[in-house]
């Protein structure tokens, strides 16, 4: 991975100038953001996220959701975002599969985007 690309993603995640901070010195929410950024910097075709906001306070929950939206809007990565909290569905997510125990899955295609 190019250093310039890594610095770009760190800046997008609010970590400009903190490239040399140790992982252990970061808060739990910051660690979660860095793990997502570490995956995003490689520009994968698909980024699979299982409960990326689980256990976070409201402030870092919103920061993570904003970060995920930035990644999705980059146009290079498709997010597969698994959550139990419907309020975490991002405005940019266009395909939603809703699962309920014992019921047929409900699939929605959102055509309007934001």
Residue positions per predicted region:
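Conserved ABC ATPase signature
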Residues: 22-26
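Conserved ABC ATPase "signature" region
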Residues: 2-18
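H-loop/switch region of ABC-family ATPase nucleotide-binding domains
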Residues: 82-84
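Hydrophobic anchor residue at the start of the ABC signature
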Residues: 36
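Conserved catalytic motifs of ABC-family nucleotide-binding domains
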Residues: 43
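Catalytic Walker B motif of ABC-type/P-loop ATPase nucleotide-binding domains
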Residues: 47-51
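ABC-family nucleotide-binding domains
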Residues: 57
